[in-house]
């Protein structure tokens, strides 16, 4: 490796989410701000929602006789 061409690597970089969650990781930046993390993302919290565009979901459920969970 060539000397003095690589960025400084911080082993204690702080990641701050808009929800207030913080955690430590390694990065070339000392502090990282994010809008969504695993604490507030719907996939990880189990609060997923189906986005219905013009009744398509209801038509699909009606066509295949499916019930909403």
Swiss-Prot record:
GO cellular component, one term: ribonucleoprotein complex
Keyword annotations: Metal-binding, Ribonucleoprotein, Ribosomal protein, RNA-binding, rRNA-binding, Zinc
Cofactor: how and how many bound: Binds 1 zinc ion per subunit.
GO BP, sorted A to Z: translation
GO molecular function terms attached to this record: metal ion binding; rRNA binding; structural constituent of ribosome
Residues binding Zn(2+), per UniProt: 17, 19, 37, 40
Keyword match Ribonucleoprotein: yes
Cofactor(s) required, per the database record: Zn(2+)
SUBUNIT field: Part of the 50S ribosomal subunit.
HAMAP family from the UniProt entry: Ribosomal_bL31_1 (MF_00501)
Protein purpose: Binds the 23S rRNA.
Family per similarity comment: Belongs to the bacterial ribosomal protein bL31 family. Type A subfamily.
Full protein name: Large ribosomal subunit protein bL31
Source species of the chain: Thermoanaerobacter pseudethanolicus (strain ATCC 33223 / 39E)
